[in-house]
From Swiss-Prot:
It comes from the Eukaryota. It is found in: Mitochondrion inner membrane. It comes from Aedes aegypti. It is an enzyme of class 7 (translocase). This is NADH-ubiquinone oxidoreductase chain 5. One of its GO terms (cellular component) is mitochondrial inner membrane. Keywords: Electron transport, Membrane, Mitochondrion, Mitochondrion inner membrane, NAD, Respiratory chain, Translocase, Transmembrane, Transmembrane helix, Transport, Ubiquinone. The gene is mt:ND5. The keyword Mitochondrion applies.
Amino acid sequence: MNYLVNYCKNSFYILIFISFTLFILSLKFLLMDLVYFIEWEIVSLHSMSIVMTFLFDWMSLMFMSFVLLISSLVIFYSDQYMGEDYNVNRFILLVLMFVMSMMMLIISPNLISILLGWDGLGLVSYCLVIYFQNVKSYNAGMLTALSNRIGDVALLLAIAWMLNYGSWNYIFYLDMMKNNFEMMVIGGLVMLAAMTKSAQIPFSSWLPAAMAAPTPVSALVHSSTLVTAGVYLLIRFNILLDNSKLGQFLLLVSGLTMFMAGLGANFEFDLKKIIALSTLSQLGLMMSILSIGYYKLAFFHLLTHALFKALLFMCAGVIIHNTKNAQDIRFMGGLSMSMPLTCSCFNIANLALCGMPFLAGFYSKDLILETVMLSYMNFFSFFLFFFSTGLTVCYSFRLVYYSMTGDFNSTTLNMLNDKGWTMSFSIFFLMVMAIIGGSMLSWLMFFNPEMICLPYYLKNLTLMVCLLGGFTGYLISNVNFFFINKSLVYYNFSFFSGSMWFMPLISTVGVVKWPLILGMYSYKMFDQGWSEYFGGQMLYNQLKIYSLYVQEFQNNNLKIYLLSYMLWVIILVSMMLFLN
């Protein structure tokens, strides 16, 4: 056991050291406006050479530092959370492979090497989702893998299409792609790949299903790695989205995703799925602001979101760990009395998610919403942005109401405490980052900020939407004296919203059902029907008839021999006469 513990600790120390080093480097690159291209010649044979290119700028270095910081804390946290697991060694290796795939994707300016990291993320995520090896995990892993395969195919098609340029280093050809309609196909394929990885409609169903993975994986996957890979890829291709049809389409899809996830989280009772739907909502927000053209804002929110979302998942993991793997929030309640540190960190992460002033989420979300108010867009897009923000506060309040207030609703055979210092250290470190991370990043990334001039009522609109969302969360959560839950009055609407607009059903049964039925009819009608009648059975009958004729010839019948002799004589005489 000590060997495994040291394995976790060593990984933690190495990753956190590299993370701080990369962060300092990213500040230097940002202040001095540096970009490094490093070419590594892998094979050189006569006139042929295979060269791998790496791109280092402030954005890639800062993103890598955040990924490694969260990965190191997740591995440290797993030391206790997965401590009793027999295969913890394998688990840590899978997490490290996952992080390496993400590193490959971040520093690649080349579609081929991006595909290596992209596929690595997909394959290792499958191994992590099925880690617990039960039927639910296998189904979730298959849904995750197959959804991401669509994005892999789109990237492969983009690679094939880029053969027109003679190089796969897309970074040099973005302006050319923007001006050439035929090459905008590459932008469309890359956008499709990003939509599958970042779980936008209609590929949203895999993200809550992936909650079958261990909680440390959820903290890593849903904060800074797998789901943000699509957003990061589109940040690199941001020129193609600016003032284009692709950007308008992405704005519609991501806005609907944001709204759907926020609405669904208000009708969900699984603790991890609520946080997963919250992630989906924030991904929709990032994609939306990216489609308008503010890629730096999308990157800023990506980093701040990584901090408080990892903290949310880690706190949820501590709660699940202490309540003997119970995830239904209706069986919780009163946790703040027994787990004060965890609940404090959980509430800080929730407030950061809602956009509470001076926490990490406030600096990015408030800036995004004020920028949206300055942008030219129709009322529908405007409504999606602000209504989804209100829904975020609504489900956050509901989550706290169910899990942390009132009386404990589960069995009494639970040891609720905050005594695990390993998990407590990880969540406390992330809590500090969730408090100071937003202000620190806003000072570093926007050292020449633009002034946003808005009327008084628009300036306070974001705050009013948040307060209204919190009040609505209280109303739909509160059970009155006659025990009529407000969220169950309109059952059909609740069922529709709670099932993510039937997205999981459409993605699984909807895709498979009709091809299976058509395949069965084809098998019955053709394989066992006409093709059997005209193929196997008829061939057998014809051969049987011909074999009977042959048997007649073999009976040594004198009449048949004379007849055949006369027939051949007639044929020969006729041929001789015809030739003469």
